[in-house]
From Swiss-Prot:
The keyword Zinc does not apply. Keywords: Host nucleus, Virion, Virion tegument. GO terms for biological process: viral life cycle. This is Tegument protein UL55. The keyword Membrane does not apply. It is found in: Virion tegument; Host nucleus matrix. The lineage of its organism: Viruses, Duplodnaviria, Heunggongvirae, Peploviricota, Herviviricetes. Belongs to the alphaherpesvirinae HHV-1 UL55 family. Pfam families: Herpes_UL55. InterPro entries: Herpes_UL55 (IPR007622). One of its GO terms (cellular component) is viral tegument. Signal peptide: none annotated.
């Protein structure tokens, strides 16, 4: 089996231009069945639910942070398929090692990032309901949303922003190489 060079992975990454700070999801999941389990926020007056789509290599309780991501300056939201591709990229072992370096320690699982959804049917918006898709980072720490946990979420935010800018830089470099090749042929 041949490995794909990281530069090719970044070229295929969706064009993510902004990653918002983390929003903690007020629920816990069991890692072994978090892929398809929807949880309702017990503290929310509205009917708000979370789907984290976590595919974790360990078992036990997890808690999650949600990152809204945008594609451009108009804050267009990426498609779910683009978010899945981005989550696959940031979960890629050589890329994930960068997060471990930022956190200063090993992660408990091999896939802490996934594509998640927040759905609100409260009628708070003019449309009556809204759905936001984004990137979810899940954590296995003993004390959910403790200082240590938030430091991990902060490192995850830095990691997502770094990888998204790497994808943008890789595409820009590829365009420059392509222009140079065209000039040489002429």
């Amino acid at each position: 089996m041949t490995t794909t060079p990281l530069s090719n992975l970044f070229l295929r990454a969706p064009d993510i231009t902004h990653v918002a700070p983390p929003y903690c999801l007020n629920a816990t999941w069991q890692a072994e069945n978090a892929l398809h389990t929807t949880k309702t926020d017990p503290a929310c007056l509205a009917a708000r639910s979370y789907l984290v789509r976590a595919s974790c290599s360990t078992s036990g309780p997890i808690h999650c942070f949600f990152f809204a991501v945008y594609k451009d300056s108009q804050h267009s939201l990426p498609l779910v398929t683009e978010l899945r591709n981005f989550a696959d990229l940031v979960n890629h072992p050589p890329v994930l090692r960068e997060l471990e370096d930022k956190r200063g320690g090993r992660l408990r699982c091999t896939g802490p990032f996934s594509c998640g959804t927040i759905k609100d049917v409260s009628g708070a918006s003019p449309a009556g309901e809204y759905t936001i898709n984004g990137i979810v980072y899940h954590c296995h720490c003993r004390y959910p949303f403790s200082k240590t946990c938030w430091l991990g979420a902060s490192a995850a935010l830095q990691h997502l922003r770094s990888i998204s800018s790497s994808g943008t830089a890789a595409r820009a470099a590829e365009q420059r190489r392509h222009k140079i090749k065209i000039k040489i042929k002429v």
